[in-house]
Design a protein with these regions (language model features):
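N-terminal amphipathic alpha-helix/helix-capping segment at the start of soluble metabolic enzymes
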Residues: 14-38, 180-192
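Glycine-rich, positively charged N-terminal anion/phosphate-binding segment
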Residues: 20-28, 50-57, 61-65, 69-108
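Active-site mouth loops of central-metabolism enzymes
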Residues: 36-53, 113-124, 194-212, 289-302
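Conserved, mostly hydrophobic/aromatic
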Residues: 39, 67, 133, 220, ...
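Glycine-rich, proline-tolerant flexible connector loops at the mouths of alpha/beta enzymes
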Residues: 65-95, 149-159, 225-242, 324-326
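Flexible, glycine-rich active-site loops centered on histidine and acidic residues
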Residues: 123-170
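Active-site pocket-lining/capping segments in soluble small-molecule metabolic enzymes
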Residues: 146, 159-192, 197-206, 213, ...
Length: 338
């Protein structure tokens, strides 16, 4: 069971049963409690859970409100045939999130939120994921379209799958209403799923403009999304403007900021390109001074710590940390915020 720090303890009434409650209830619990949450990656196939559990143990000191478990579509590999041509095959390098989510929740007593994505999945496969999660008593999920395959220029839906997050939401809503994807009634419907979605303070890379991007977020809220968590960002001003514009068009769900400390020198150029996020000028100036991984790590810790402090000062009580390749940095930021 995770250790509880006084300044970050959840309301006792909530904490007793938070493994089986709507995450948005935790996010809107009131009282000024500061909530951390963390996102982790399933282990590579064949490597076991020891390293993952060791990582989670490092975060348990901060009494996380919940832990997200990512999922990724299969990757393409090329196999040479006898005739000299190449065949493109899908290979899955990491297990799905269902078993990992159950193992984390049972071992650590922390609410878990597995990701369910359109990418690489059929509607039937998603339906079985929902059934498995319901059997395990996991009621919170994050619904995402997922990234395009590495070799594809644009997102290509899996045959029999979904093209958009809204299609995935429709399937989950039908399941919640007591129907399988083919319209067959579920004889013994279980508890309904609560779900969150993603949002983008600097616009999704495929959105025509910010207004259209916000329109789709509003649509997801109206379809039933309980909260949204942002893509990582380094400029709080963009987050505040995004939230302001969202509220102006009637988006009322919690918008949780996603923070990822820079942890090594290569990330100073890779992160803005891969995640389509800008460095504010102050960060860019300091980034150019970094000569080593340690320089970049220290800058990342200091910048993210100050980001979080500004968010707290502005009344944001829930912060979500992206931990991949930044576990120790995230832990240090969280420690400084206690």
């Amino acid at each position: 069971m995770c250790k509880i720090f006084r300044n970050f303890v959840l309301v006792n009434k909530i904490r007793k049963d938070n493994k089986k409650m709507n995450i948005s209830d935790i996010l809107t619990s009131g009282g000024g409690e500061k909530h951390f949450s963390f996102e982790v990656l399933p282990p590579l196939k064949g490597t076991g859970t020891e390293r993952l559990f060791s990582t989670i143990e490092k975060f348990c000191d901060f009494d996380p409100a919940y832990i997200n478990i990512t999922t990724h579509h299969s990757e393409y590999v090329y196999r040479e045939l006898e005739n000299g041509q190449y065949e493109r095959l899908r290979v899955r390098r990491r297990p799905g999130t269902v078993a990992i989510a159950a193992a984390i929740q049972n071992k650590f007593g922390v609410p878990v939120i597995p990701h369910i994505i359109c990418s690489g999945a059929t509607a039937e496969a998603i339906e079985y994921e929902l059934i498995d999660l319901q059997f395990l008593g996991i009621e919170n999920v994050l619904l995402l379209r997922g990234d395009k395959a590495r070799d594809d220029s644009q997102f290509v839906p899996t045959p029999g799958g979904h093209a958009h997050t809204t299609d995935l939401i429709e399937q989950v809503n039908r399941f919640n209403e007591g129907f399988f994807n083919d319209g067959t009634p579920i004889k013994n419907p279980g508890k309904k799923f609560h779900y969150g979605v993603a949002c983008y303070p600097e616009k999704h890379e495929e959105a025509l403009n910010m207004e259209m991007d916000l329109k789709y977020l509003k649509m997801k809220q109206d379809m039933g999304a309980d909260y949204a968590v942002t893509q990582l960002f380094y400029d709080n001003r963009k987050y505040f403007r995004f939230v302001e514009k969202a509220r102006e068009i009637g988006i009322t769900i919690p918008i949780v900021p996603g923070i990822k400390p820079l942890a090594k020198l290569s990330q100073l150029t890779v992160v803005p390109r891969v995640f389509r996020c800008d460095f504010p000028q102050e960060l860019a100036v300091e980034a150019l001074k970094c000569k080593t991984d340690d320089d970049a790590r220290q800058l990342g810790i200091e910048w993210s710590t100050e980001q979080c402090r500004q968010l707290y000062k502005a009344g944001v009580n829930n912060i979500h940390f992206y931990t991949v390749s930044a576990v120790d940095s995230v832990r240090e930021v969280a420690r400084r915020l206690l």
